[in-house]
UniProtKB/Swiss-Prot annotation:
Belongs to the krueppel C2H2-type zinc-finger protein family. May be involved in transcriptional regulation. GO terms for molecular function: DNA-binding transcription factor activity, RNA polymerase II-specific; RNA polymerase II cis-regulatory region sequence-specific DNA binding; zinc ion binding. This is Zinc finger protein 75D. Residues 22-35 have a biased composition (Polar residues). Its main location: nucleus. Residues 327-342 have a biased composition (Basic residues). Keywords: DNA-binding, Metal-binding, Nucleus, Repeat, Transcription, Transcription regulation, Zinc, Zinc-finger. The lineage of its organism: Eukaryota, Metazoa, Chordata, Craniata, Vertebrata. It comes from Homo sapiens (Human). A zinc finger (C2H2-type) spans 365-387, 393-415, 421-443, 449-471, 477-499.
Length: 510
């Protein structure tokens, strides 16, 4: 009901123009329905939105035309032919969110042209925590950076970027910087490697130009070298650590320092939990590991899940630098329960899978039979069963054997009478999900398998194979008594019944 009260001002707000390009405009009021119908044909999204919510019953000649006009306006507004369901939902939620904001907040947020709900949320939260004197100035770090961390784009049309000014470090800031530097030294990280900032890599190429004023933060290097215990080989993982020089650290505001503090704390916690070792330039080994949620392959963007997690933790903290020593980071993490340390054998496959077994995605394990390659040896062992015919998994009830453990588990359900998959049309139950999907094609009429010879279609692939034998003349089923061949197993079974009947007649005294 609140959407019905959406006024014309909110429908014509700038965020609509940010999402879709406006094409054409018309006068809103018309007394004749035919003229009105002609006018709405070429409406742009903003005008269509405005007309949709302001449309009245008397503007049409009856209920049928009223519904028709509303459908046209809604279609021109939402553009379902070019936008996904998620985009349409995003647009509706954004419009409603802006329409229910207090008037002062609504005007200020609309002035900055949020492109999506996440950017609007950042703007509103920024407005709530900032004093009145600073509401009109929005810095790149306060909004653009947070928008990226929440999964949105860093730059929106209408944003006025204001670079943060360098501020002299006080006693607390010096202590905070020293803590940051100590952690870098503890982990053996180099603070002078140059690379592109993570948040810049998450921005569209066309929007990168708007971040030219942010070049003062360009020493983000995400790399660590891990030496795995025993005889395991060296693995290099990029996109793990964040680096700043002392001069760059002075330019960061408390919000940013809190962000980097949280990132390093998470890295250090998970580094210790795996019990691996890091090799630094001095040759000393320090216990270290890598958070699997933070690892990204080289050249990829920061994942949306990771960005949101970091942003939520950062925005929820008021006082940056609550933890002032590496030792505290290692000993206690009050905000979340520490995970049970995992062994290297448990975590290595995950790390190798995330990183593609090295920088090039190498697949060193090759099948000698067919030449197919695999990333880990266990996959090669499983694949080799196809060539050898090995079926190591045996059913204890019927002695049937299976190549994969998953197949044995599915088969076991048939003995137990478990049929968890139920058809919503007829109520029939099935033990396997694939059987349910095949059955539902009877109700939907779907026939995805087509014969290339005659064009006839079938519900199941097995039916297509049987049909194709009528074209090829193949007869794979042979009678063991008379050596007659058949194209279908059912035909062979009927034929074998004739043999049994003849034998019964010969044995019978009558």
């Amino acid at each position: 009901m609140a959407m019905r009260e959406l006024n014309a001002d909110s429908c014509s707000s700038p965020q609509m123009g940010a999402m879709w390009e406006t094409s054409g405009s018309v006068k809103e009021n018309s007394s004749q329905s035919k003229k009105y119908s002609t006018k709405i044909e070429n409406l742009g999204p903003e005008s269509a939105c405005r007309h949709f919510w302001s449309f009245r019953y008397h503007e049409a000649t009856g209920p049928l035309e009223t519904i028709s006009q509303l459908q046209k306006l809604c279609h021109q507004w939402l553009r379902p032919e070019i936008h996904s369901k998620e985009q349409i939902l995003e647009m509706l939620v954004l419009e409603q969110f802006l329409s229910i904001l207090p008037k002062e907040t609504q005007n200020w947020v609309q002035k900055h042209h949020p492109q999506n709900v996440k950017q609007a949320l950042v703007l509103v939260e920024f407005l709530q925590r900032e004093p009145d004197g600073t509401k009109n100035e929005v810095t790149a770090h306060e909004l653009g950076k947070e928008a990226v961390l929440l999964g949105g784009t860093a730059v929106a049309p209408g944003f006025k970027w204001k670079p943060a000014e360098p501020q002299p470090m006080g006693v607390f800031q010096k202590e905070y910087w020293n803590t940051y530097r100590v952690l870098q030294e503890q982990l053996g990280w180099n603070t002078h490697k140059e690379t592109q900032p993570v948040y810049e890599r998450a921005v569209h190429d066309q929007q990168m130009l708007a971040l030219s004023e942010q070049k003062r933060i360009k020493h983000w290097k995400m790399a660590s070298k891990l030496i795995l215990p025993e005889s395991l080989s060296l693995l290099t993982f990029e996109d793990v650590a964040v680096y700043f020089s002392e001069e760059e650290w002075q330019l960061l505001n408390p919000l940013e320092k809190t962000l980097y503090n949280d990132v390093m704390q998470d890295i250090y916690e998970t580094v210790i939990s795996l019990g691996l070792k890091l090799k630094n330039d001095t040759g000393n080994d320090h216990p270290i590991s890598v958070s699997t949620s933070e690892i990204q392959t080289s050249g990829c963007e920061v994942s949306k899940k990771t960005r949101m997690k970091i942003a939520q933790k950062t925005m929820g903290r008021e006082n940056p630098g609550d933890t002032h020593s590496v030792q505290k980071w290692h000993r206690a993490f009050p905000r979340k329960k520490r995970k049970k340390p995992a062994t290297c054998k448990q975590e290595l496959p995950k790390l190798m899978d995330l990183h593609g077994k090295g920088p090039t995605g190498e697949k060193p394990f090759k099948c000698q039979e067919c030449g197919k390659s695999f990333r880990v040896s266990s996959d090669l062992i499983k694949h080799h069963r196809i060539h050898t015919g090995e079926k190591p998994y045996k059913c204890q009830q019927c002695d049937r054997r299976f190549r994969w453990s998953s197949d044995l588990n599915k088969h076991f359900m048939t003995h137990q009478g478990i049929k968890p998959y139920r058809c919503s049309w007829c109520g029939k139950s099935f033990s396997h999900n694939t059987n349910l999907h095949t059955h539902q094609r009877i109700h939907t009429g779907e026939k995805p398998f087509k014969c290339d010879e005659c064009g006839k279609r079938f519900i199941q692939n097995s039916h297509l194979i049987k049909h194709q034998r009528t074209h090829t003349g193949e007869q794979p089923y042979t009678c063991s008594l008379c050596k007659r061949n058949f194209s279908r197993r059912s035909s062979l079974l009927r034929h074998q019944k004739l043999h049994r009947r003849r034998e019964a007649c010969l044995v019978s005294p009558n």
